[in-house]
Amino acid sequence: MTLSRAKHANRNHLPHLLAKVPEEHQEPIKNMCLKMMSHDAYGQPYDWSPRDFEMGAHLGRGKFGRVYLARERHSHYLVAMKVMFKEELRKGCVQRQVLREIEIQSRLKHPHILRLLTWFHDESRIYLALEIASEGELFKHLRGAPNHRFDEPRSAKYTYQVANALNYCHLNNVIHRDLKPENILLTSTDDLKLADFGWSAHTPNNKRRTLCGTLDYLPPEMVDGNSYDDSVDQWCLGILCYEFVVGCPPFESNSTESTYSKIRRMEISYPSHLSKGCKELIGGLLRKESKGRITLVDVMTHYWVKAGMAERELQLQKRERGKENTARN
């Protein structure tokens, strides 16, 4: 897919942005959509450009991109603008990854998937206008937590939300393939947004062989060079849940070969502080045989997840009451 073709395909997608958008944001997004549509109606397709946005504070950076707070000049709608230099993408041989990310993420609309609102490019840069997740990478919060781990109620809630997002992806024939805390963002309401679809794949036939993702999260079938299906995401969810409650991935080692060996031998140890339900869920996801892994629906309905979500809600309510009492005093 060329940049131009992807851009026009994405523009046809914009009127559907209002679906599941919070009411207070519907009018600004509608204005953005109408602005594009009105130009198209007169036979002059409107191309977004940096001139349409006021660029603000620097929010962060990745290997190939920098993210800024930006405001659309007409509607004043705030976005997180990811800016990537084409030359850096070319040198890193990741042009196809970026196009795949744009093509797939622009079509996914789910409350726990970071929304790609639109995109455009100029001679030297590519711009992705993304939904804002104000609390940033989940990895930062995990590293900042006591003992670098979350408690079980918080972990259960986050596991549910990621499972929900992945289930939606699979229903749309998309495998994420690079699940990890760095690729998940957190909102001010303690909700997760799955992001970074650079390694994702649209798989109607549901079979792949590409080795990709993050070393500590690789499933046995990838390590052994075998074909795989969307159940690799279940494996990665098991690793993620383990990292939530323990503070590190289960197969982490000081070398690639050692990590591969641990994955092949399924060397998993569970600390004594983990509950029976937590270990049961992780064990159901981390099965060497992909067909034996529990489904994402099984995850969402698991008793440990449901109980943890309820307890997390009570934690958040208590925290809000504490803030209100502090404000009064």
Swiss-Prot record:
Catalytic activity: L-seryl-[protein] + ATP = O-phospho-L-seryl-[protein] + ADP + H(+); L-threonyl-[protein] + ATP = O-phospho-L-threonyl-[protein] + ADP + H(+)
InterPro entries: Aur-like, Kinase-like_dom_sf, Prot_kinase_dom, Protein_kinase_ATP_BS, Ser/Thr_kinase_AS
Gene: aurB
Enzyme Commission code: 2.7.11.1
Gene Ontology annotations of biological process type: chromatin organization; chromosome condensation; female germ-line stem cell asymmetric division; meiotic cell cycle; midbody abscission; mitotic chromosome condensation; mitotic cytokinesis; mitotic sister chromatid biorientation
UniProt subcellular location: Chromosome; Cytoplasm, Cytoskeleton; Midbody
Domain named Protein kinase: residues: 53-305
Assembly, per entry: Interacts with Incenp and Cdc37.
Cofactor needs: Mg(2+)
Keywords: ATP-binding, Cell cycle, Cell division, Chromatin regulator, Chromosome, Chromosome partition, Cytoplasm, Cytoskeleton, Kinase, Magnesium, Meiosis, Metal-binding, Mitosis, Nucleotide-binding, Serine/threonine-protein kinase, Transferase
Basic residues bias: start-end ranges: 1-14
Active site annotation, chain numbering: D178 (proton acceptor)
Name by which UniProt lists this protein: Aurora kinase B
Main location: nucleus
Record-stated family: Belongs to the protein kinase superfamily. Ser/Thr protein kinase family. Aurora subfamily.
GO CC annotation: centrosome; chromosome passenger complex; chromosome, centromeric region; condensed chromosome, centromeric region; cytoplasm; kinetochore; meiotic spindle midzone; midbody
Species, as recorded: Drosophila melanogaster (Fruit fly)
Highest taxon of source: Eukaryota
Residue ranges, annotated region (Disordered): 1-21
